[in-house]
Amino acid sequence: MNPHYARLVTLAAVSATAVALVLFIMKVFAWWHTGSVSLLASLVDSLVDIAASLVNLLVVRYSLQPADTEHAFGHGKAESLAALAQSMFISGSALFLILTGLQHSLEPQTLHAPEVGMWVTLIALVATLLLVSFQRWVVKRTHSQAVRADMLHYQSDLLMNGAILVALALSWKGITRADSLFALGIGGYILYSALRMGYDAVQSLLDRALPDDEHRAIAEVIVNWPGIRGAHALRTRRSGPTRFIQLHLEMDDALPLVQAHQIADDLEQALLKRFPGADIIIHQDPVSAVPENQRGRLTA
C-alpha cells in the first residue's frame, strides 16, 4: 500500500469527522435558540455526517490493510461498502427532512432570533467549503471512492447551508413558509445525491470496468508495442486505490518463451508507469491459437 495514499485518505476521514462534530454542536445551539426547521434539517444532517464519517474512517483504515492469505486481492472493496453505507445514512436523513418540511409547511411557525441561526450557518458554510476543497484535492491524488463519497455528501451540505441562509433571511422578513419550503428542497436534493452515491458504490462492488479514457490510455501503450501481433480480452476493474488490468497478447508462434516473457515484462513496466500500483496480468498467446475473429480486438 502506498504510504502517501494511506496518509491522505486517513487525514481526509479524520478531518471530516472533526468538522462534522464541531458543526453539530454549533447547530444544536442555533436550533435551540431559533426553532428553525431548516436548522433542524441541518442539525440532523450533521448528526448523520458524524455517523457516516466515523464509519468512513473505520472502513478506510481497514481498506488500507495489505493483502493477506484470506484476501489475496487486498481490502479495497471496503471503500465501496463505506460509500454504500453512507448512501443509506443520507437517504434516511433526507426522508426525515422531507417529512418534517411537509409538516411545517402545513403549520408554519414563527422563528426566534433568526440572526443567531444565520451566523452559525455562515460559519458552517465556510467550514464545509474548506473541507470540500481539501477532500477534492485528496480525491484528485488518490481516487479514493470512500473520500469521494464523503466529498459528494459535504458538497450537498454546501447547497443546504446556502439555502438555510436564504430561508432564515426570508423568515426574518416575515415569510414564514420559506423555512419549511427550503427544508423540502434540501431534503429532495440530498435524497438524489444519496441515490447517485449508492449506485456508484454498487457498480464498484460489481467490478465495473475502468473509465473509457483509462481504457484508451491502456490501448495506446499496447497496440504499437514491439514484438506483439495484437492484443485482445482486455478486462479491468478497480478495488480501492488499486487498478486491476488483465489482457492477452498475440505473438509469433516461433517466438522463444524467454523472449515472449521479456516482451510481456517490459510492457507491464510501461503500463505501471502510466498506472502506478496497478495489478497487471498478461497472458501470451501464440497467434495461431487465437481465432481470427478475436485477433487484434484491442485498438487505441
UniProtKB/Swiss-Prot annotation:
Its main location: membrane. It is a multi-pass membrane protein. Gene3D superfamilies: Cation efflux protein transmembrane domain, Cation efflux protein, cytoplasmic domain. One of its GO terms (cellular component) is plasma membrane. Disulfide bonds: none annotated. The keyword Kinase does not apply. One of its GO terms (biological process) is intracellular zinc ion homeostasis. It is found in: Cell inner membrane. It catalyses: Zn(2+)(in) + H(+)(out) = Zn(2+)(out) + H(+)(in); Cd(2+)(in) + H(+)(out) = Cd(2+)(out) + H(+)(in); Fe(2+)(in) + H(+)(out) = Fe(2+)(out) + H(+)(in). Zn(2+) binds at D45, D49, H153, D157. The chain crosses the membrane at residues 11-31, 40-60, 81-101, 114-134, 156-176, 182-202. Belongs to the cation diffusion facilitator (CDF) transporter (TC 2.A.4) family. FieF subfamily. Divalent metal cation transporter which exports Zn(2+), Cd(2+) and possibly Fe(2+). May be involved in zinc and iron detoxification by efflux. Homodimer. This is Cation-efflux pump FieF. The gene is fieF.
